[in-house]
Design a protein with these regions (language model features):
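Short basic alpha-helical hairpin corresponding to helix-turn-helix/winged-helix-like nucleic-acid-binding
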Residues: 124-133
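N-terminal alpha-helical interaction blocks
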Residues: 13, 21-122
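Short functional micro-motifs and their immediate structural scaffolds
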Residues: 150-153, 171
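Short cysteine-rich clusters marking metal-coordination/redox-active sites
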Residues: 145-148, 163
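Short, positively charged and aromatic/hydrophobic N-terminal segments
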Residues: 3, 7-11, 16-18, 37
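Non-catalytic linker/capping segments at the edges of enzyme domains
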Residues: 146-147, 154, 178
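N-terminal strand-loop-strand
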Residues: 157-191
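Short, flexible, mixed-charge glycine/proline-rich loop motifs
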Residues: 132-140, 152-157
Length: 191
């Protein structure tokens, strides 16, 4: 019985690795040789070629075609730069969050649930989309001080919101996780 379960578990793991094109690596942050730079740039201004991430609920404005996942560029949004917040840089291309209460995208682009990005290609764009989602949620949920209720201000030196009244400082959360695989000999039981 245990040997049969081990075979099934190992087969499922192999199928997942093949389905995700991961070659055995199914981690979304495996984007080598690309590199994501998340240093805060307070004076960054989006270029026409900068990537734009815009969310409507849990859905991201994007396009998926035969060449994979694509994000719109700044050139597709005619309004002012004040609506854009710098997020990070991925191999020379800057990514900006478009803060818009009434999301509307350029023609040919649609909103897709963020859960699909786990298996989308190219992997580095999918990772950028998920990373942008985490920062989008942090900005959305970090508008008022948890101590005194005062509206927060963005710090000029680092990615931090601070309270001008009581001095409270709020940084993006890091949620560590542990990844476990249950094995029996050479078989993967629980991936």
């Amino acid at each position: 019985m245990l040997a049969e379960a081990a075979k099934i578990g190992y087969t499922i793991g192999e199928k997942y690795a093949k389905a995700t094109n991961s070659g055995g690596r199914a981690m979304i942050h495996d984007i080598e040789p690309k590199h994501l730079y998340n240093e805060w740039k307070p004076n960054a201004v989006p270029k026409r070629s900068s990537a734009v991430v815009q969310f409507c609920g849990r859905n991201l404005l994007c396009r998926i075609d035969d060449n994979g996942l694509k994000l719109p560029s700044r050139a597709m949004f005619p309004d002012g730069d004040e609506r854009f917040t710098y997020l990070f840089e991925l191999d020379g291309r800057e990514y900006y969050l478009l803060r818009d209460e009434t999301p509307r995208g350029p023609g040919g682009w649609t909103y897709r649930d963020i859960n699909i990005f786990r298996t989308e290609q190219p992997k580095e764009i999918a990772f950028a989309a998920v990373s942008a989602w985490h920062l989008c949620c942090w900005y959305r949920d970090t508008r008022f001080c948890g101590r005194c209720g005062t509206p927060l201000e963005h710090d000029v030196n680092e990615r931090m919101m601070h309270c001008p009244r009581c001095g409270n400082m709020i940084f993006p959360r890091i949620n560590p996780s542990v990844i476990v695989a249950v094995t029996h000999g050479d078989y993967l039981l629980l991936p």
